[in-house]
Amino acid sequence: MKKFILPIFSISILVSLSACSSIKTKSEDNFHISSQQHEKAIKSYFDEAQTQGVIIIKEGKNLSTYGNALARANKEYVPASTFKMLNALIGLENHKATTNEIFKWDGKKRTYPMWEKDMTLGEAMALSAVPVYQELARRTGLELMQKEVKRVNFGNTNIGTQVDNFWLVGPLKITPVQEVNFADDLAHNRLPFKLETQEEVKKMLLIKEVNGSKIYAKSGWGMDVTPQVGWLTGWVEQANGKKIPFSLNLEMKEGNSRSIRNEITYKSLE
């Protein structure tokens, strides 16, 4: 990331928003195509990764879309591990766990060696440890989970009949526009949860600090669907306290590294 990435980002997005023309979407927000310069630059990041994707950036009620597959903005995909944000909110709000509780590793082999240890919810969020959040979902239970997902109006709100994998394989699906709006609401404490609960989860999402600005985000990788889908959803909190939500969505193809989502997002925020 360049030295002035976040300050430059905040200025450039203001310029692009003032110069763009609106198009119709399923969102109630005003949706805009970015300036030609930004569109070409960010499109090239997806092209270079040999994948198709979009990143949506929100300021106020204005949404700007960038990438080489803009139609993805309103298409539904499994949320994969981005659902950990809501999973944690629901679990903490309903006293199914605490931020200090240690989730014990059961000794079984996991997808990644880094998951093979005891973890708190915050540590599991940082490592995107699926088994920990599957256990949290089982504690919540199918009935309460469905009630809460509908109450928040997350995506298509359909969690099906199995409580511990609906965000990985479906039937729960969500659009990038809905994801960025969810991030916006969490960033500004507008979700229907206690302020304390939202603040606890937000602390788990801090992934980078640059020049006084912070990036809060959660990645997702839908490996069990075809084609595979990748996410990075969150917000930039500038030094002055202003928050700018974003959601990156792309197709994860063979040969794509785990870091491609962060790399494209960071470059797009320059």
Label the predicted regions.
Residues 1-23:
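Sec-dependent N-terminal signal peptides of Gram-positive bacterial secreted proteins and lipoproteins
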Residues 68-74, 117-118, 126-133, 160-167, ...:
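Flexible glycine/proline-enriched surface loops and loop-helix/loop-strand junctions
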Residues 76-101, 124, 246:
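Active-site SXXK
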Residues 20-44, 139-141, 190-210, 219-270:
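Structured C-terminal helix/loop/strand segments within mature extracytoplasmic catalytic/sensor domains
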Residues 30-31, 101-146, 155, 172:
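Conserved catalytic neighborhood of penicillin-recognizing serine enzymes
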Residues 120, 135-183, 188:
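Mid-domain, small-residue-enriched loop/turn segments at the edges of structured enzyme/sensor domains
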Residues 23-75:
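Beta-lactamase-like hydrolase cores
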Residues 92-108, 193-198:
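Short, well-structured active-site flanking segments
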